[in-house]
């Protein structure tokens, strides 16, 4: 298994950017892969491109627009408003069915062609917002499936799986990239960079985590 190279599933948001710089500390060669699935917050792809260009990281954007046709949701459809809070039952309407399944599967195909075994993704079960494809059991299951499907030894690594947003901010701080993550990323479902709209679930979670992180710094 090649332990010197890694591919990061990279959206241009807080979590994946933190994982990208975490990977740069651990591996000699890091490649970032993003997806265009006709997301409303497509400005995140511009953030991803800008970050990779600025910090000299090889970057690829794969076309997955088909996902928008298959799975109507508030992240890809202009006529669906993003839920401001998670529903009591079921998944939020911002959940894109099959997104992480497809992202990781396509990245695995890409990785195998490059002779890379390690795939890094920023999913977290601690702050998973009700998304079933961010759970550890799903990632472990998919890892086994991909290995069997392609007769290849992949290792899917999830640095944020068991930490919350405050701890993710602390990781960025410890890596020396806090300002990059704070100012140059886009997490907002409404496509507003840095602090975002302040109203969507992603912005609320990001802000709550940052305030908790600030308290940690003061102690």
Swiss-Prot record:
EC number: 6.3.4.20
Pfam families noted in UniProt: QueC (PF06508)
Gene3D superfamilies with a match to the protein in the record: HUPs
Domain of life: Bacteria
Biological or metabolic pathway of the protein: Purine metabolism; 7-cyano-7-deazaguanine biosynthesis
Matches recorded under CDD domains: QueC-like (cd01995)
Binding residue positions for ATP: 10-20
Cofactor stoichiometry and binding remark: Binds 1 zinc ion per subunit.
Single GO MF descriptor: ligase activity, forming carbon-nitrogen bonds
Enzyme class, broadest EC rank: ligase
Entry cofactors: Zn(2+)
Keyword ATP-binding among UniProt keywords: yes
Binding site for Zn(2+): 188, 197, 200, 203
Catalytic reaction equation(s): 7-carboxy-7-deazaguanine + NH4(+) + ATP = 7-cyano-7-deazaguanine + ADP + phosphate + H2O + H(+)
GO BP annotation list: queuosine biosynthetic process
The entry's keywords: ATP-binding, Ligase, Metal-binding, Nucleotide-binding, Queuosine biosynthesis, Zinc
Self-association and partners: Homodimer.
Family from the record: Belongs to the QueC family.
Function recorded in the entry: Catalyzes the ATP-dependent conversion of 7-carboxy-7-deazaguanine (CDG) to 7-cyano-7-deazaguanine (preQ(0)).
Protein's recorded name: 7-cyano-7-deazaguanine synthase
Species of provenance: Clostridium botulinum (strain Langeland / NCTC 10281 / Type F)
Lineage: Bacteria, Bacillati, Bacillota, Clostridia, Eubacteriales
